[in-house]
Amino acid sequence: MSITDVLSADDIAAALQECQDPDTFEPQKFFQTSGLSKMSASQVKDVFRFIDNDQSGYLDEEELKFFLQKFESGARELTESETKSLMAAADNDGDGKIGAEEFQEMVHS
């Protein structure tokens, strides 16, 4: 699966443009611009599986650091503060990782 199988390349490019500078990543803005927030719950979970590098069923801080690169290989890494902020926004049960359900809830919040 390629991310452009489910999201428009133009929308992804626009979303990445908005957060190309360090410490400018805003999850909700990214989800809206990229089109993720308009997708069904099952489509968002498909994207989650694409982002989940080790297929563990969870995203940890190391995977989140490379979040933008899953949408475009040349994109920057998230800063430590952006990574921690993204984790805090989605990790509802406080276990230090984001499950598919938590990811979907964050995208649609």
UniProtKB/Swiss-Prot annotation:
The record lists Ca(2+) 1 as bound by 52, 54, 56, 58, 63
Q: Start and end of every EF-hand domain?
A: 39-74, 78-109
Residues the record lists as binding Ca(2+) 2: 91, 93, 95, 97, 102
- SUPFAM superfamilies linked: EF-hand (SSF47473)
One Pfam family per UniProt: EF-hand_7
Q: Which GO terms describe its molecular function?
A: calcium ion binding
Q: Which CDD domains does this entry report, sorted A to Z?
A: EFh_parvalbumin_beta
| Keyword entries, A-Z | Calcium, Metal-binding, Repeat
As for family, the record states: Belongs to the parvalbumin family.
Q: Which named protein is this?
A: Oncomodulin-2
